[in-house]
C-alpha cells in the first residue's frame, strides 16, 4: 500500500524563514517524511530540495496589492497539489491554496492556526485594503476546513471565539515543537565576540521581528530600569511598518544615550549563531502582547536559559511560571489587538520581573535546567508528527 501523500502549503520554507510558522513547517516536514510521502509547496525562489516546489508571484500581478499577489500564488499552488491525499495549509498566506485544492481535487484540508487575522487588526497598516482579503482567505478556509490544528489551548479558544461557525469538534491542539538536538547549549563565544556581546557581563536577550504583537517597544522602555552592568541584546529586524521601525529606532537611541551594552543586530542570523547568543543570555525576554504559542521561548528554554515572558496567549502553556521562568501579568484590550490597558504598568511589571530574576543567580540556573528538561520531555517533533498524522487519518487522508 502506498504511503499517504501529504502536501504542505506554506509561505515560508528554508532558507526563506522569517517567523515561527516557517520554523514549524521546516521541522514538521522533516519528521513527517518518516511517516508519509511529503510534498512542500512554498513561496519564493526555487529550492534544491527534493519534493519542494516554490512559486513566484505571478508577473501579471506585479505592482498589485500585496494580498492580491499572495492569492495569485495560492491559485498556482492549488493546481500543483493534484494527486495528493490531504492538503495542510499554514497561515493565511497559504489558506486559500488549501481551500481551493480541497474544492478542486476533492481532498481533505487541514489548517494549522499559528495566528489569527481578527486578532491582528494592526495589519491593516501593512496591507491596506488587502487586510480585508487576508481576513476573507482565513475565514473561508477555517470555516470549511476538515480539521483545524491549534498550536496551543489558548489558540483553540481564540479560533472558536473568532470563528463561531467552526465546529469545536474539528479543532485539535497539537503544540509547536523544538529540535532539542539542534537547540542545545553552545558554550563557545566566537559569535558573541563578533557581535560585540561581552560574555563576562549579564545580558537580557530578545529575539524576534519588529511588530506590534512582539512588544519590543515595551521592553525598550522597561530596559531603562535594568542594572547598569546588564547588556540588552536585540536580535531584531524586519519591521512590519515604517512607523514601528521608527519607534524602535528612537527608543533604542534614547537607551544607548543613557547606558552602555545595548547591542542591536538587525540582520537575520543563522540558527547556530542565535543558539550561542541564547545560551549565554542571563535571561531571555518575550514581551509579546499577542503570541499563540511563542516557539522562541522553547528555543531559549532548550538552550538552558531562564525566561521572562508575558502571560498571554499560549505562552503560559510553554513557560512554567516559577519553574522555567517568570510570567509578566497583563490586562489587555478586548478588541483583538492585545494592547495593554495600562501600558505603564505593563512596562513596570516587565522591568520588575527581569530585575527580580537578575538578582537571583541560583534561580536563573535552576530555571534554565528545568526549561531544558521541559522542552525535551514535552515538545519533541517526533511526537508532534505522530499527532499530526492522526489528524490526517481522522479526516480520511
Question: Residue spans of the language-model regions?
Answer:
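Nucleotide-sugar donor phosphate/pyrophosphate-binding loop at the beta->alpha transition
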Residues: 107-108, 118-140, 157
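Glycosyltransferase donor-sugar binding loop
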Residues: 46, 178, 231-249
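Aromatic "clamp/platform" in nucleotide-sugar-dependent glycosyltransferases that forms part
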Residues: 289
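Short His-centered aromatic/hydrophobic patch
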Residues: 89-94, 113
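Carbohydrate-associated surface elements
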Residues: 154, 177
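Short hydrophobic beta-strand element within catalytic cores of glycosyltransferases
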Residues: 306-309, 319, 326-327
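Nucleotide-activated donor-binding/catalytic signature segment of Leloir-type glycosyltransferases, i.e.
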Residues: 245-268, 272
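A conserved mid-protein helix/loop that constitutes part of the nucleotide-sugar donor-binding site
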Residues: 23, 202-225, 246
